[in-house]
Design a protein with these regions (language model features):
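Glycine-rich helix-loop "coupling/hinge" segments at transmembrane-helix boundaries
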Residues: 142, 241-267, 511-538
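Soluble N-terminal domains of membrane-associated systems
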Residues: 2, 6-10, 160, 193, ...
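Juxtamembrane helix-boundary/capping and inter-helix hinge elements in multi-pass membrane proteins
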Residues: 78, 113-116, 192-197, 207-210, ...
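Short helix-to-coil transition segments within interhelical loops
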Residues: 192-221, 265, 389, 471-492
Length: 570
């Protein structure tokens, strides 16, 4: 535990805390009560902010629906049913195309736990999660589009001009680009939970590859499949940016893109209400199913660096596994390499000199910084309140407030950003210029959307620090800001930095809210990138995509490094 640079209490305070590994609820002493009360109050304020954001969106939908109920009901027409059908169809196809190949790639990586470059491949498979969706879409177009690097090859194979991949094909390729690596990592993590005794016994019995798969690997994969497939399905039905950029027209429209079109192009609030309610219902059903399955809805993984090898692999299987791994690697690396090549081909110097680009970069940086700061503050407040309530409960069932501090941030998974933005758009359009509050909406929505990820980084560290220090802080009456600065900060600085960097990366690359509220006066880098794509300035778009991708990737890598690096004194 790091020593504390203060005259009173003495530096031995942290050492004294380490001699009390178990903490009792701080029921005695005014200091303990003040500490619990202040932490609970902070948690209540955080919950109120989340409730206001989501509740305001629902209020906007309900008010608009009540104002024009007949119009909202009439919006349930064949077009709406066609949009729902396409939303489900593209999500089902994307899930199948992502998860089924991932089974074989994950098994191939599991069967070869040690080979040169394996760790690098797994790191590359984590990169798509760090890329903004619009950057990946540009890379896919640069590779497979009508004027892409592979267009000539595809034209020669097909015997006619390559039409490009706009529409369902482009959506599927982009979804597989994001979700195949994620599925591989999740399934590989499941395979690495197989007990070592089973592998040793299989080796002693001389078990071949097929019996080992049927008796050892498949039961583990079968148990993990529903959660992985459900997570991928949820990501696909809430995919806004990919469908917006690669959909190519009304025939390839999902519910979220329909909401955007109804508000920004058609200005049909009644249809927007109907689409939003359907999107909420669909997302709620999927999240409920994921919760029942115990799926990892955040999608993070924790892969061992040097797993052990148990069974020998014959030459034929090794060759087949190598082909699978190389094909998956090429599929993932291709769009990323195309993004870099196309971006370097743009006039980056001219772009950097444009006032519009500089303003968009500054706006993105400021909004992302504020969003990340707010997300970390809300996450820390909920974490502290949850811990204080748990310590004060002693025994018996958890209270409603404790449940809320534990799972309140998870409700944002049910309500996608475009839905929250649509609700507030409808609520505020009667009060004035909705585009004037674009910065507020971008900061608040992105902050709340990043909270599930921030909580994953902050909560374990705070609980561990509380376990060590709670009793001593109660005895000495250390609470509030003094406790956070002197006692908790040394243990929390890295987790908080991890959460901040990841939340900032998510906000920088987000297009959902700014797509609704953006205007010429408020433009972020993703919004400007979309505008350049819409005006067919593809070289400029490629250059902006490269800049945005580098910044977001650097932030996520920093978050990953901060999360893995151990604090030497803790």
């Amino acid at each position: 535990v790091p020593t504390l640079s203060t005259a009173s209490p003495p530096p031995r305070l942290a050492d004294t805390a380490s001699r009390h590994p178990r903490s009792d609820p701080p029921h005695k002493g005014d200091g303990g009560r003040r500490a619990s009360d202040s932490r609970i109050t902070a948690g209540i304020i955080a919950l109120a902010a989340i409730t206001l954001l989501i509740g305001g969106a629902f209020a906007g939908l309900l008010i608009e629906g009540a104002h024009d109920f007949s119009g909202a009901w009439a919006a349930f027409d064949p077009y709406l049913l066609r949009v729902v059908r396409f939303t489900l169809w593209q999500a089902i196809l994307s899930t199948l195309l992502s998860v089924i190949p991932a089974l074989f790639v994950a098994r191939a990586l599991s069967r070869h736990p040690r080979f040169f470059g394996r760790a690098f491949i797994l790191q590359l498979f984590a990169v798509p999660l760090a890329l903004p969706a619009i950057v990946a879409a540009l890379g896919i177009l640069a590779l497979y589009g009508r004027a892409g690097y592979f267009a000539g090859l595809f034209s020669a194979i097909g015997g006619r001009g390559w039409p490009g991949i706009y529409g369902l094909s482009g959506i599927l390729v982009a979804h597989v680009f994001f979700n195949l690596p994620l599925s591989v990592r999740l399934l590989l993590e499941a395979l690495q939970t197989i007990p070592a005794d089973q592998w040793r016994l299989a080796s002693q019995l001389g078990m071949g590859a097929r019996p080992a798969f049927r008796l050892i690997e498949w039961p583990t994969l079968r148990a993990a499949l529903p959660g992985v497939a459900g997570l991928v399905f949820m990501l696909c039905i809430t995919s806004f940016t990919i469908v917006l950029t690669l959909g190519g027209g009304p025939a390839a429209t999902t519910l979220e893109v329909g909401i955007y079109q109804a508000l920004r192009f058609d200005f049909d609030p009644a249809r927007a209400v109907s689409l939003t309610l359907l999107q909420i219902a669909l997302t709620f059903i999927v999240v409920l199913a994921l919760t029942r399955l115990g799926a990892n809805v955040v999608g993070d993984t924790n892969l061992p660096v040097a797993p052990r090898r148990y069974l020998s692999v014959n030459g034929t299987e090794a060759s087949l596994n190598a082909v699978l791994i190389v094909l998956a690697l090429l599929f993932v690396v291709g769009p990323m390499a195309a993004t870099v090549v196309a971006g370097l081909g743009a006039d980056l110097g001219r772009l950097a000199g444009e006032a519009t680009v500089r303003q968009a970069m500054l706006t993105s940086a400021v909004l992302a910084f504020l969003s990340a700061l707010l997300s970390v503050m809300l996450s820390l407040a909920l974490t502290m309140a949850r811990r204080a309530l748990a310590l004060g409960r002693r025994a018996g069932p958890r209270t409603l407030l404790e449940h809320a501090t534990d799972t309140g941030a998870g409700f944002v998974l049910v309500v996608p950003p475009i839905v929250i933005g649509a609700g507030w758009f409808l609520l505020l359009r009667h009060a004035g210029d909705v585009f004037a509050i674009a910065p507020v909406m971008v900061v608040t929505v992105n902050a709340v959307m990043a909270m599930p990820f921030a909580l994953r980084a902050v909560r374990p560290a705070y609980d561990a620090a509380s376990e060590r220090h709670e009793r001593l802080c109660a005895q000495l009456g250390i609470s509030g800001w003094a406790r956070l600065r002197l006692v908790d900060w040394p243990s929390l600085r890295r987790p908080l930095a991890t959460a901040f960097a990841f939340a900032m990366a998510l906000s920088l690359g987000d297009l959902g809210v700014i797509a609704l509220f953006g205007s010429d006066s408020v433009q972020t880098l993703p919004y400007l990138l979309l505008a350049r794509m819409g005006s067919y300035r593809t070289e400029d778009a490629a250059g902006l995509a490269l800049l945005l991708g580098i910044v977001c990737l650097a932030l996520v890598l920093a978050a990953d490094w901060l999360g893995r690096e151990k604090v030497g004194n803790v």
